[in-house]
Curated annotation (Swiss-Prot):
Catalytic activity, reaction form: prephenate + S-adenosyl-L-methionine = carboxy-S-adenosyl-L-methionine + 3-phenylpyruvate + H2O
Role according to the record: Catalyzes the conversion of S-adenosyl-L-methionine (SAM) to carboxy-S-adenosyl-L-methionine (Cx-SAM).
Enzyme class: transferase
Binding site for S-adenosyl-L-methionine: Y39, D89, N90, D117, I118, N132, R199
Catalytic activity, EC: 2.1.3.-
Annotated keywords: S-adenosyl-L-methionine, Transferase
GO molecular function: carboxyl- or carbamoyltransferase activity; S-adenosyl-L-methionine binding
Top-level lineage group: Bacteria
Family to which the UniProt record says this protein belongs: Belongs to the class I-like SAM-binding methyltransferase superfamily. Cx-SAM synthase family.
UniProt name for this protein: Carboxy-S-adenosyl-L-methionine synthase
């Protein structure tokens, strides 16, 4: 059962910083659908990408898996029985619900769900790694190191999907897309109070980068091919491929 997100519908005296606690986990499916434009498209396309990039005998990582939406989408399209998905999140509330959610659906692809820090979890023999709206919650100083580790753990020909909320160098365009995102949330039933309170809680926790900064980091990590494949307002997703020799 999906619970409606009304966490911020009444004034909160002391907001504090955002955490992925039990209250957020309970309403997360509704929250993200109503807050992130294009989220359903990205999830379904991640499933399609898994069908293309998964290789027998390899591992697929869903880093910052939340309740497992991307993991489920990938399991539906992977045809190799000996390909394993490893889903990782550091929130106990998210991981608990993710385990219950994943176990409710039968699939032939083995799936391991781990409560751990994505900055330190080993990445090995990977054909696909997914960071779906996760990097933006890491300290900026940790981001390049994580990408370097992902690149090292990917097999040649493997891919990284990196979905994020973006900031923009062009202030006019950035302001327009920011306003359009708020229009999107209003259209999905969020009040001005809800939008304002959630933004206040996120502003010290979710630190966004421009597409250009993301691409620069990916190139520095070693990815020979990196491009934006999806964008809706100030949300989007990049795909990066670890090149075969000579590519």
């Amino acid at each position: 059962m999906t619970h409606r997100d009304d966490l911020f519908s009444a004034p909160i005296a002391s907001l504090g910083d955002w955490t992925f606690d039990e209250r957020v986990a309970e309403v997360f499916p509704d929250m993200i659908q109503r807050s992130v434009p294009g989220y359903s498209n990205i999830i379904s396309m991640i499933g399609m990408l898994a069908g293309r990039f998964a290789r027998p005998g390899t591992q697929i990582y869903d880093l910052g898996c939340a309740l497992g939406a991307a993991t489920l989408a990938m399991r539906r399209t992977i045809s190799h029985g000996d390909c394993r998905i490893i889903a990782v999140d550091n929130s106990p509330a998210m991981i608990d619900r993710c385990r219950r959610h994943i176990s409710a659906f039968h699939a032939t692809t083995p799936t391991e769900i781990i409560e751990d820090d994505i900055s330190t979890v080993p990445i090995e023999n990977a054909s696909l790694v997914v960071l779906n709206f996760t990097m933006q919650f890491l300290e900026p100083a940790q981001r390049q190191t994580l990408l370097n580790r992902i690149y090292a753990g990917l097999n040649t020909g493997g891919a990284l999907v990196l979905s994020e909320k973006f900031s923009f160098q062009d202030q006019l365009i950035g302001g327009l897309l920011f306003d359009m995102h708020h229009d999107f949330k209003r259209a999905n039933g969020y009040s001005e109070l809800e939008i304002s309170q959630k933004r206040s809680m996120l502003e010290n926790v979710m630190l966004t980068d421009t597409v250009e900064v993301h691409k620069q980091r990916l190139v520095e990590a070693g990815f020979g091919h990196a491009e934006l494949w999806f964008q809706c307002f100030n949300f989007g997703s990049l795909i990066s491929i670890k090149p075969e020799s000579g590519q």
